[in-house]
């Protein structure tokens, strides 16, 4: 079996296990019972079709088990492509007092400079990873302070003996999540000696298509999403963690399973025949 076929199969195994649990839950363990819904929420039932609440019943039981799906899939790709992957990996090292102060300074400037700059008639400061990191690393004075960072995903290239850390967020992360990730990444890059060879802010999928067109505003407060080399979006992330062809293997894995499970959901849960249009696919 080719490497990318192996990655696709491993990804599908993870998704299939999760989807089978969802289907077992909504069909057997906790099905939507119309009479129970009408008895518990008579006003809602009188105003809104039962089918709307049937769909929301499924959604609630789908989103909870899929909360950590991106991390699980990334670990599978890392294990198949690089040789080792793990979620919630703890990295412990030391960072000098001066570098920690500068990390705080950089983050505070990005968080609070808007209003002050406007009062002075100045342009807001734009995030620039390369210059920010250079500024932090140029001062290594003071005591070495113990620092612990928990990585969303950690991977090792077993052949090349290289270590990678990823702050992996959903494709549309909020501002607070992104700030925390940037602080963790700056600490990883500022450790002396370094405990990982590279660390990245990663989004597993780009709903805007190309990186140049990524326009979700919240992470852009902390990173230049189009230019910062520490940012990996979509195929950049999957190729880094799994090797060439991993992104297409991921896309193919999801779309193949999507056809199968959509048919089951229509017939077994909604009780209707699927439409001719199978719906959205990942691209």
Region locations from a protein language model:
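Conserved catalytic cores of phosphodiester-cleaving nucleases, focusing on short active-site segments
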Residues: 78, 151-172
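Active-site metal-binding core of divalent-cation-utilizing nuclease and nuclease-like domains
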Residues: 90-159
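Active-site-adjacent loop/helix micro-motif of nuclease/hydrolase catalytic cores
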Residues: 172-183, 210-212
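Arginine/glycine-rich "motif VI" loop of SF2 helicases in the C-terminal RecA-like domain
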Residues: 189-196
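Surface-exposed cleft-lining segments at the edges of enzyme active sites
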Residues: 59-61, 135-141, 167-176
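Extended alpha-helical scaffold and adjacent linker segments that couple domains
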Residues: 2-9, 17, 135-145, 154-156, ...
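Nuclease-adjacent, charged terminal/linker segments that flank catalytic cores
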Residues: 1-95, 276-283
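Domain-level recognition of nuclease-like catalytic cores that cleave nucleotide substrates
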Residues: 202-283
């Amino acid at each position: 079996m080719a490497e990318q076929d192996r990655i696709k199969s491993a990804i599908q195994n993870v998704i299939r296990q999760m989807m089978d649990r969802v289907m077992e839950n909504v069909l057997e363990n906790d099905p939507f019972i119309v009479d129970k819904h009408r008895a518990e929420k008579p006003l809602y039932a009188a105003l809104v079709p039962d089918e709307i609440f049937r769909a929301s019943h499924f959604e609630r039981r789908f989103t909870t088990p899929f909360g950590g799906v991106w991390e699980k899939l990334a670990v599978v790709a890392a294990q198949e492509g690089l040789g080792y992957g793990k979620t919630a990996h703890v990295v412990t090292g030391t960072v000098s007092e001066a570098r920690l102060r500068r990390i705080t300074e950089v983050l505070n400037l990005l968080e609070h400079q808007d209003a002050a700059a406007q009062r002075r008639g100045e342009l807001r400061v734009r995030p620039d990873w390369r210059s920010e990191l250079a500024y932090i690393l140029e001062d290594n004075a003071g005591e070495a302070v113990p620092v612990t960072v928990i990585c969303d995903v950690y991977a090792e290239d077993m052949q090349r003996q290289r270590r990678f850390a990823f702050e992996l967020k959903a494709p549309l992360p909020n501002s607070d999540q992104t700030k925390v990730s940037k602080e963790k990444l700056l600490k990883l890059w500022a450790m002396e000696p370094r405990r990982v060879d590279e660390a990245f802010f990663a989004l597993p999928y780009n709903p805007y298509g190309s990186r140049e067109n990524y326009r979700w505003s919240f992470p852009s407060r902390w990173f230049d999403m189009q230019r910062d080399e520490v940012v990996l979006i979509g195929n950049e992330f999957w190729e880094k963690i799994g090797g060439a062809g991993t992104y297409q293997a991921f896309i193919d894995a999801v779309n193949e399973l999507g056809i199968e499970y959509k048919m089951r959901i229509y017939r077994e849960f909604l009780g209707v025949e699927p439409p001719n249009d199978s719906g959205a696919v990942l691209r």
